[in-house]
């Protein structure tokens, strides 16, 4: 009789993680059968998708409100089928708003639950820990400091490392990356990453471009490179660029990269850069794994500030840092210019230091290398081991 594992992943990053976990599960239990909501990476590992992953994908609060009836229907169908089929364990991958609610219902019905990718309770809404304690039999976390938080709260937890640490090279090759991007090996290169969402680009791109103008006043030969995830985002960015022109700026999408098509275009740009001006988010971790000096920035719209303040109920976050590299190093290793501090002048000054201070760059490289080594684990094997222990009643 095969071992049945229920799973729900709600976005591409979760699909990628879950696909690798299913591979790890098959190595430990070849007859395992995984089913629920997932995407192509999971299905490539034999996953049975009751609903496609994109059925859970929403873009912002307005889209979420429009999709409430559909999401509630999918939630109800998934819950009923999980309760009927009673898998040996359920694994929710990220998507906490959907998965924690489902995990609570399943756990109350006697189905053990595992949640992979802990919600960012360390940044805001720490009170969610109570919901997690009730809903989750075992947490799988990507960062070592998260393990400490859950251990302190008495929640079973396993630190499994971050999958990106096994994909991004320990020793990046700047010259090879510049060759792929047709950049001169000897020129000074600033990567500009204003985010992947339209709202982020609208808010951050004007500030980042004005900072680039100030930097080019200091160094007219400075090359600025902006990766864009798709042509639509590129068009949105180029509309803003027309208002804040930067001499020689290159806006790059995947088709502009020679070879290495499987690698995200942003990774090639990070690897090629001397320094990076980057929106807070996963891109800061990717930049750190490429060992590049960076300046982290983020600006919420006034409307979003009010929503976040209402939802968090906190005047300050649980940790004093926002950028993942600083959170991991427990130090302001790289500058964070947020909200009213994210002025073109301050961004330009911090970016100039990142571009020109070689001693600082060497220190950053050493610290980020140590961080990379700490995050490098056999994530699929560790996650699969913990899930199988929960499924067999040992977790």
UniProtKB/Swiss-Prot annotation:
<keyword id="KW-0808">Transferase</keyword>
<keyword id="KW-0443">Lipid metabolism</keyword>
<comment type="similarity">
    <text>Belongs to the LpxB family.</text>
</comment>
<keyword id="KW-0328">Glycosyltransferase</keyword>
<dbReference type="Pfam" id="PF02684">
    <property type="entry name" value="LpxB"/>
</dbReference>
<comment type="function">
    <text>Condensation of UDP-2,3-diacylglucosamine and 2,3-diacylglucosamine-1-phosphate to form lipid A disaccharide, a precursor of lipid A, a phosphorylated glycolipid that anchors the lipopolysaccharide to the outer membrane of the cell.</text>
</comment>
<dbReference type="GO" id="GO:0008915">
    <property type="term" value="F:lipid-A-disaccharide synthase activity"/>
</dbReference>
<protein>
    <recommendedName>
        <fullName>Lipid-A-disaccharide synthase</fullName>
        <ecNumber>2.4.1.182</ecNumber>
    </recommendedName>
</protein>
<dbReference type="GO" id="GO:0005543">
    <property type="term" value="F:phospholipid binding"/>
</dbReference>
<keyword id="KW-0441">Lipid A biosynthesis</keyword>
<dbReference type="GO" id="GO:0009245">
    <property type="term" value="P:lipid A biosynthetic process"/>
</dbReference>
<comment type="pathway">
    <text>Bacterial outer membrane biogenesis; LPS lipid A biosynthesis.</text>
</comment>
<dbReference type="GO" id="GO:0016020">
    <property type="term" value="C:membrane"/>
</dbReference>
<keyword id="KW-0444">Lipid biosynthesis</keyword>
<dbReference type="InterPro" id="IPR003835">
    <property type="entry name" value="Glyco_trans_19"/>
</dbReference>
